[in-house]
Amino acid sequence: MTIYNFSAGPAVLPKPVLVKAQSELLNYQGSSMSVLEVSHRSKEFDDIIKGAERYLRDLMGIPDNYKVIFLQGGASLQFSMIPLNIARGRKAYYHVAGSWGKKAYTEAVKLSKTIPFEPILLASSEESVYDYIPEFDEKEIDPEAAYVHVTTNNTIEGTSLYDIPKTNGVPVIADMSSNILAVKYKVEDFAMIYAGAQKNIGPAGVTVVIIREDMINEEPTLSSMLDYKIQSDASSLYNTPPAYSIYIAKLVFEWVKSLGGVDAMEKANREKSGLLYDYIDSSEFYSNPVRDKKSRSLCNIPFITINKDLDEKFVKEATERGFKNIKGHRSVGGMRASLYNAFPKQGVIELIDFMKTFEAENA
């Protein structure tokens, strides 16, 4: 039985990447050391981390005036690092279109009680369980504000922000954790991009930060570990980095490039997600909660049946058939198919076949 992993993260990795990692696990490039053992100060790891940055810059078209930093703590730590480093007593706007955007805003509010800055909720769709991307008038934004924070893909709710809104000249910071390298964005549209690795980049443990040089703090922050300038000046080696996660990320970047880059990934993702959305839309048994079809995520597709009991039955039977981790997030229920870059089109085809059978037996 073929297993298809629909996990929202940690997520499926490309099979060629896993095979190469397996081959280098015991003896990395003739060093007689496992890649798990090489020192982060060694030539071997220097080649790994520089190669990872080089491939990422090429894939995303990252300009020279942006720094790439490999950090720890997940994307969630960035919810604190961003205001600590960048807010500096100014206003900071938050566009909240999903649960993770809400967490970023909530963390900012918490920090503002001890650090001088003013987090402002710019727009939110929480009142309708984030089933659409909220709009705002850029004139509402103070042009002297530190930043506007957005989330480009909402893994739980299944929406995406494809067109970056105008912000009255204020720098845009994006949490791109779940659709980085899956959808093409212009890096210059953002002052900073950050992404946890465990969806389209690699295993959990490393967070990629792409930050324009003029956004990097000159004054020290509360902690050296949380200081973008210190981390950037140390070339991501202020302390021991998550070396193996960076190694896998490099292999994933190589794999993406070998298949044609981000353009090819987006094309494949549109094909995969389109198959599933088309079937759901044609069915009276299944439904997708996203109000605006143009805002539907290519990477995370939530859906439900006609009642919660059948949702539970679907998850149980799907899991038994090899469709793993298809249960929806605990906050919304139902099901969720996460179709990241490494997820095969054949898995979508077979899921749809199962959905048809389940509908015929339970409608």
From Swiss-Prot:
Give the modified residues of type N6-(pyridoxal phosphate)lysine.
Answer: K199
Q: Which GO terms describe its cellular component?
A: cytoplasm
The subcellular localization recorded is: Cytoplasm
Question: What GO molecular function terms would the record report?
Answer: O-phospho-L-serine:2-oxoglutarate aminotransferase activity; pyridoxal phosphate binding
Where along the chain is pyridoxal 5'-phosphate bound? Answer: A75, S76, W100, T155, D175, Q198, N239, T240
Q: Does the keyword Amino-acid biosynthesis apply?
A: yes
Task: Give the EC number.
Answer: 2.6.1.52
Under InterPro entries, the record lists: Aminotrans_V_dom, Pser_aminoTfrase, PyrdxlP-dep_Trfase, PyrdxlP-dep_Trfase_major, PyrdxlP-dep_Trfase_small
Q: Which residues cross the membrane?
A: none
Q: Which cofactor names does the annotation list?
A: pyridoxal 5'-phosphate
Catalytic activity as recorded in UniProt: O-phospho-L-serine + 2-oxoglutarate = 3-phosphooxypyruvate + L-glutamate; 4-(phosphooxy)-L-threonine + 2-oxoglutarate = (R)-3-hydroxy-2-oxo-4-phosphooxybutanoate + L-glutamate
* Pathway assigned in UniProt: Amino-acid biosynthesis; L-serine biosynthesis; L-serine from 3-phospho-D-glycerate: step 2/3
Which top-level group of life is the source organism from?
Bacteria
Q: Which UniProt keywords apply?
A: Amino-acid biosynthesis, Aminotransferase, Cytoplasm, Pyridoxal phosphate, Pyridoxine biosynthesis, Serine biosynthesis, Transferase
Give the GO terms filed under biological process for this record: L-serine biosynthetic process; pyridoxine biosynthetic process
Residues the record lists as binding L-glutamate? R41
Q: How is the cofactor bound?
A: Binds 1 pyridoxal phosphate per subunit.
Q: What does this protein do?
A: Catalyzes the reversible conversion of 3-phosphohydroxypyruvate to phosphoserine and of 3-hydroxy-2-oxo-4-phosphonooxybutanoate to phosphohydroxythreonine.
Q: Family, per the entry?
A: Belongs to the class-V pyridoxal-phosphate-dependent aminotransferase family. SerC subfamily.
Self-association state and partner proteins as the record states: Homodimer.
Q: What is this protein called?
A: Phosphoserine aminotransferase
* Gene behind the chain: serC
